[in-house]
């Protein structure tokens, strides 16, 4: 089975895009590990190891997608490093801050 360059790039981008749905620490870890893995695959000369790396990455994408859905089911507070988002929760926090300053 030959893997096209387009498939590899799409897989890489999908993993990075899906990783952004995680909280800060998991997101940064997953992005860093993904970049490192694909840098290794870029210089891999053995086709069998390359294809196995792609299969592992496809499994990783499935795991990340499943886990991001599970994480999204639970209401969580953002870490300080993430800042306030533009969701309804962020708007409520901003309105309370403005009211307390008045």
Swiss-Prot record:
Location of this chain's protein in the cell: Mitochondrion
Cellular component per GO, a single term: mitochondrion
InterPro entries referenced in this protein's UniProt entry, alphabetically: Complex1_LYR_dom, Complex1_LYR_LYRM4, ISC_assembly_LYR
Single GO BP term: iron-sulfur cluster assembly
Disulfide feature: none
Domain of life: Eukaryota
Keywords recorded for this protein, A-Z: Mitochondrion
Free-text function comment from the UniProt entry: Required for mitochondrial iron-sulfur (Fe-S) protein biosynthesis.
Family under the similarity heading: Belongs to the complex I LYR family.
Protein name: Protein isd11
